[in-house]
Structures are given as structure tokens and as C-alpha cells.
């Protein structure tokens, strides 16, 4: 039997390499609104889907949209109390250890508590 091997052409390899560098889908980065932007945001324009004769609670939808935006903004803020960068309203609790501990010198053995 002969040891015939099938090889790919160089132009095909280059084409495959070029294709792999292109993103498959579009990537969109979106900045979250700042607290000032959320407060300054005006209510959305009324929907064009409103039909005459239909009762509508105008304030409920606006409140839900703005409330959701504020809720999502708050979720992005970590307030665990144990991390740097938390706001002044976050208080972390650290329990003090009031028992004296003797740290042994090199070669002394186990520390006494």
C-alpha cells in the first residue's frame, strides 16, 4: 500500500484562518445609567396602541418602567459590606478577638491560646 495522504492547499488554510477572526454575531456594549440620569429621565411618550373607549391607568405603566430601571441599577451595585468601594451607608461587621495570643519564636512549637 502506498502512504498517500491528502493535504489541504495553502490558500484554503489562509481562508479558514481569516474566517475564524471574524465575530459570529454583533456585540453591543451598553452603559448603565447613572443615578443622576435616572432621576432626570422623563416619562416615556404615550403608546400609540391606545384605543378610544378603553380605560387606562396612565401612571401605573410609567411607574413600573422607571421602577424597573432603578431596581436594575441597584442590582448592579454590590452592597455586601465586605468589599472595598462600598458606600458609606454599608457597614461591615468585624468581631474583635479579645483573647491574647502568644506568637512562638522560631522552633518553639505550638502557640498557646
Swiss-Prot record:
This chain's protein is named P antigen family member 3
Protein species of origin = Homo sapiens (Human)
Residues of the region (Disordered) are: 1-61, 78-113
Q: Which residues form a coiled coil?
A: none
Q: Which gene underlies this protein?
A: PAGE3
- List the biased-composition ranges (Basic residues): 1-12
Q: Which family does it belong to?
A: Belongs to the GAGE family.
**PANTHER family linked to this entry:** P ANTIGEN FAMILY MEMBER 3, P ANTIGEN FAMILY MEMBER 5-RELATED
Q: Which InterPro entries match?
A: GAGE (IPR031320), GAGE_fam (IPR008625)
Amino acid at each position: 500500500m502506498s502512504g498517500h495522504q491528502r493535504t489541504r492547499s495553502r490558500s484554503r488554510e489562509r481562508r479558514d484562518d481569516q474566517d475564524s477572526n471574524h465575530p459570529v454575531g454583533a456585540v453591543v456594549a451598553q452603559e448603565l445609567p447613572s443615578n443622576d440620569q435616572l432621576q432626570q429621565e422623563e416619562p416615556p411618550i404615550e403608546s400609540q396602541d391606545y384605543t378610544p373607549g378603553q380605560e387606562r391607568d396612565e401612571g401605573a405603566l410609567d411607574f413600573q418602567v422607571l421602577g424597573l430601571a432603578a431596581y436594575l441599577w441597584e442590582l448592579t451595585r454590590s452592597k455586601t459590606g465586605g468589599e472595598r468601594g462600598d458606600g458609606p451607608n454599608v457597614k461591615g461587621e468585624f468581631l474583635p478577638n479579645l483573647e491574647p495570643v502568644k506568637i512562638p519564636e522560631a522552633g518553639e512549637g505550638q502557640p498557646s491560646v
